[in-house]
């Protein structure tokens, strides 16, 4: 189960202190989603309930005990998400439908009578973009899972983490995350009011905001989905939810926890629109099928991980999924930049492995004495069988040189698997898979962007959205016209994520303007 992962893995949500106890956000897959008594007896706090699973906060010290309960199928620690996103209205014909009566349509379709839900962070709650012409807020309510200063939220008899703020308290709010403007930007595009010549797509909609702040993880997205859909049911209005958050890691076949929740909620509760991502043109993906048994000296695929010169600090993660119940092993190489020789190589790692590296780590099991002469950091590998029956090999690497004279060793990875085993692998940090000259028996291939979309879009009952160039010029705040002739108007933007997933589906389903879009900014 995912609970076997050490909580220090960077893919996972940070540990929180709740009444002096270390707690972590999780999904718990259950044989009976109502049978949670023993989980709460062990200190777990149940959040939103979905078919076959619940969200929860559980004590770190009780993770293994909860995972061992008979009624529990799997415990999955929350995983961090990443942010993905005038002329835009005209090129998408939004102006036409917003003024529908003038064009023979039965109504003006500007979002009136619809709940527009946004799940994001970096929201300026009192921006003019979210007010009507009289200066009154259009935000009906705000839910913040990381803020307990509002009113507690109870749904289906359980209390969600964090709190809510109704429209009478919006004026007292500032922002959930001053270091980001992403949520202000995406919310204005979706439902912003008329601000001069600019407007969002649905300026007549009722706005419900779920502001994640620094807790931008999949569990809090699930809690926010439940919050928005329950509000829409309560007021008796249809609901559209926009989410421009996602993750590069995951099976990309619609079976991850958040995909299944989207599938459930998208059946009848809401129209859910998801950003495909902004990783088109980045070579972060490898797909391969092994032919012939591999040995330690004769792998048949590998790649150089760009931007990972260990002498200048290497920090990246690799997420590899076998398409079967046969694990894919990995080996890391440090290549000398002067003569392309192998400076160091790990063994083949096909089970949980953890290298503790650096001064002060001598007492740790897994202490790597050789690398500790040069670096501090870690190499971690976790191998788990997931809910789709396939085996995930996830790895994190962090190497920081101890001295200025440590060479900038290049890092590469080699993959190992049995004959016929097929796998997909993504390098999940700001790196890429790249060709490199052969080193000994080790060969290296380029990665591609052919499966670059966010894992969350691969489920059912959602609309995946890519982006195209709606405009290639805009007026800067200083009054200077900015123009980029490289990207023609109407063309798919080069960084728009796309691909054919392992489940055979092509993504995204639609595209919207996503380059040089004028939108709101966080004033904080």
Question: Can you name each region flagged by the protein language model?
Answer:
Residues 1-106, 115, 128, 303:
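Autoinhibitory N-terminal propeptides
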Residues 257-269:
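Catalytic-core regions built around general acid/base machinery
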Residues 39-40, 50-69, 188-191, 199-203, ...:
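Mobile, glycine-rich extracellular loop/lid and propeptide segments
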Residues 211, 228-253, 275-276, 412-420:
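Short acidic, glycine-rich surface-loop motifs adjacent to enzyme active sites
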Residues 101-220, 236-237, 269-271, 283-284, ...:
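Subtilisin-like serine protease catalytic core
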Residues 25, 300-331, 401, 409-431:
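Hydrophobic beta-strand segments within beta-rich accessory/binding domains
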């Amino acid at each position: 189960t995912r609970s076997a992962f050490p909580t220090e893995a960077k893919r996972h949500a940070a540990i929180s202190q709740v009444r002096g106890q270390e707690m972590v956000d999780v999904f718990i897959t259950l044989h009976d989603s109502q049978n949670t008594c023993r989980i709460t007896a062990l200190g777990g706090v149940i959040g939103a309930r979905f078919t076959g699973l619940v969200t929860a906060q559980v004590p770190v010290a009780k993770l293994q005990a909860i995972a061992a309960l008979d009624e529990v199928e799997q415990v999955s620690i929350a995983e961090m998400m990443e942010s993905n996103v005038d002329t835009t209205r005209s090129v998408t014909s939004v102006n036409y439908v917003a003024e529908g009566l003038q064009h023979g349509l039965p109504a003006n379709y500007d979002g009136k009578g619809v709940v527009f839900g946004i799940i994001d962070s970096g929201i300026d709650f009192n921006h003019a973009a979210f007010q009507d012409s009289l200066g009154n807020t259009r935000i009906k309510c705000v839910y913040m899972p990381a803020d307990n200063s509002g009113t507690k939220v109870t749904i289906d008899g359980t209390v969600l983490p964090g709190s809510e703020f109704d429209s009478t308290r919006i004026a007292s709010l500032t922002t959930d995350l001053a270091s980001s403007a992403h949520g202000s930007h995406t919310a204005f595009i979706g439902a912003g009011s008329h601000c001069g010549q600019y407007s969002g797509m649905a300026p007549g909609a009722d706005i419900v905001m779920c502001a994640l702040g620094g807790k931008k993880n999949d569990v809090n997205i699930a809690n926010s989905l439940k919050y928005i859909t329950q509000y829409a049911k309560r007021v008796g209005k249809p609901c559209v939810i926009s989410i421009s958050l996602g993750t590069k890691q995951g099976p990309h076949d619609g079976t991850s926890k958040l995909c299944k929740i989207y599938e459930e909620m998208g059946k009848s509760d809401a129209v859910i629109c998801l950003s495909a991502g902004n990783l088109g043109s980045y070579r972060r993906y490898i797909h391969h099928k092994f032919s012939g048994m591999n040995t330690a000296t004769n792998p048949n695929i590998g790649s150089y991980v760009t931007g990972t010169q260990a002498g200048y600090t290497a920090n990246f993660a690799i997420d590899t999924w076998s398409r079967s119940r046969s694990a894919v092993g990995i080996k890391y190489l440090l290549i000398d930049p002067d003569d392309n020789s192998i400076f160091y190589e790990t063994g083949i790692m096909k089970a949980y492995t953890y290298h503790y590296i650096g001064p002060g780590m001598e007492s740790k099991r897994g202490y790597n004495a050789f690398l500790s002469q040069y670096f501090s950091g870690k190499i971690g590998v976790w191998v788990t069988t997931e809910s789709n029956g396939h085996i995930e090999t996830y790895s994190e690497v962090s190497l920081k040189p101890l001295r200025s004279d440590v060479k900038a060793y290049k890092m590469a990875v080699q993959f190992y698997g049995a004959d016929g085993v097929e796998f997909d692998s993504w390098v999940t940090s700001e790196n890429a898979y790249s060709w490199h000259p052969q080193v000994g028996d080790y060969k290296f291939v380029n990665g591609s962007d052919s499966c670059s979309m966010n894992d969350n879009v691969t489920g059912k009952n959602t609309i995946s959205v890519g982006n195209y160039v709606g405009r290639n010029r805009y007026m800067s705040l200083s009054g200077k016209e900015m123009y980029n002739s490289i990207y023609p108007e109407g063309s798919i933007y080069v960084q728009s994520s796309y691909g054919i997933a392992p489940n055979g589906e092509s993504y995204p389903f639609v595209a919207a303007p996503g380059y040089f879009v004028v939108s709101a900014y966080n004033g904080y």
